[in-house]
Amino acid sequence: MIGSKTKRKAREESGASSKPGTNSPANAKGKAKNQTTKAVKAEPKEEWGNQAEARDEAVARTQPAISTEPKTVTWKVKKKKDKTNARVMAQAKTELPAGPALVPHTKSDALPTSVVITVTKSEVKIDTGIEASLKGAAKATDKRSIKQKPEIKKEVCVKSRAGDKAKEVCVKSSAGDKAKEVCVKSRAGDKAKEVCVKSRAGDKASIVINTTDEDEDYVCSWFWTGEEPSVGSWFWPKEENPLQVYQPPPKVEEEPEPPDTFDYALKKKAAAWLRGRFIVLVPIEEPQPSLPPDGNWTLVATLIETPLGIRPLTKIPPYGGPYFQTLADLKNQIREKEKYGPNPNTCRCKSRTFSLEPVDFDKLVALLKLTRDPFIHEIATMIMGISPAYPFTQDIVHDVGITVMIENFVNNPNAKKYPRTLNINANPDAPEEVKETEAHVNKVCRDILCCPLNCSVQVEELKLLVSLSVKFDYHHVVIYYVRYFISLLNKGSVKIKFQILRVLLCLSKNQANTRELISAEVMSSLVALFHKNESKANILHIIEIFENINFQFKKRAKLFTKEMFTKSELISIFREAKEFDQKLQDLTDHSDPDVRDKVIRLILKL
């Protein structure tokens, strides 16, 4: 409908101009000028609206579109009327700037701009020059149509704020029951201005476009083009220093401290064995050429078993080997201490230092030659300053006297009562002493056999024999009486059996006694006691005896040749072994868990 009305008006204007005397260019210019002048004089009250409209036209002339290429507005009318319309538009373009309602437009931030979008049903493309001429030509027709159709309204609201406020352009138009709205909002300061332009477009219908915040950039691009991507850059220059975003420093993960893996139990064990170490002064029968001629006595480091292994009791010098210190060296050290005083670099834990004169030292050495008691030698080493001493030990030695204490220990008869049990020296005894000991062991074995059966004296003698059988030196004497002890094992009480089994257990640890222990008589007696009614202690002892025999037999099997055993002995051994195997199977169901474990381990070893 809108297009048909526009075409009808164009035809009327073209028909009037086609009459004689009116189709000249001068008549067309005059007609357009008269129409423009009449329109301005007829409505003086609408000066503000015309001024806003002129600003819109100026904006259309100066502001380029989104695309930088020039665009034209093409009106689809008859080809023979194009020249007349073009001349009318050119005349209107030249006269509009002279009108009182036009305000020249400059690109300033303080001057508010207005936007009027008038679209007909025909194809529209925005151009800076042609659009202004079209609006100037259609101005008169719009004024005449205001009185005929009051229901068509058009409102343009332009709101702008200088500073940080918002700028809003609202274009409202109505055509019958349809309405659309264009809102452009921008912020530029704290002030606001508002321009409202109302116009009525006769038979033309405006298209109103509503925009939201999302389409803000797209709508603004119709009127402003630039390289600035933000709306705020239209009113103030781009900030030189952009906002800095706070970023927390990266967290540095601290490595956890390694846990304390110190073994305090080992420290306690080490402290325990340190208290039991000692050094023995022993004579050297064959003097070595490297030692001084007067150095007949040396301090020999005793090797003991510690939690960390076998270690010497004294310090090892850099060159290696045992730690030897002659008495001459000790005398020189004593003279140096007497001359220069005590060494300041000594351990502070020593509250008092020993002062030993050379005469006292010689007397002490003479006393040490009379005894081999390790306790007396330990005290002597503390007095000489070789081994550390505790404060209370130092006080006792000083109160009693050094030489007096050693002399009392040497002359004490209790010190000579059990010299063998206290002596730990590895050197062999003298031949006379060995003979005396062997005679003593032989006498003990005879006393055991001569005593009444199951008497208390017999039990005590067996206990003494157990202590003498600990060392391998006298096993050759005890093994001679094994066949007599087997008879006591079969006839004696529980206590007698227990002590005899202890003696056999000590003998089974020696490899030289293996052949005698695996004889037919011993094996049969041990197997006979291997039943559930026997006491737990006796069964455990028998199991240990067989474990030792099995270990020694497998370790040195090549030594047991056919010449060592007769045929009857080998048959009896295998026969007893078969019976022993059956009894082991029966003891796997023993009520005591310790016995069951021992039996199972022995079966696995065999």
UniProtKB/Swiss-Prot annotation:
Basic and acidic residues biased stretches: 40-59
UniProt biased composition (Polar residues): 15-26
Top-level taxonomic group: Eukaryota
SUPFAM superfamilies: ARM repeat
Region (Disordered): 1-85
Entry-linked InterPro entries: ARM-like (IPR011989), ARM-rpt_dom (IPR006911), ARM-type_fold (IPR016024)
Pfam families in UniProt: Arm_2
Cystine connections: none
Family: Belongs to the eutherian X-chromosome-specific Armcx family.
Name under which the protein is recorded: Armadillo repeat-containing X-linked protein 5
Organism: Mus musculus
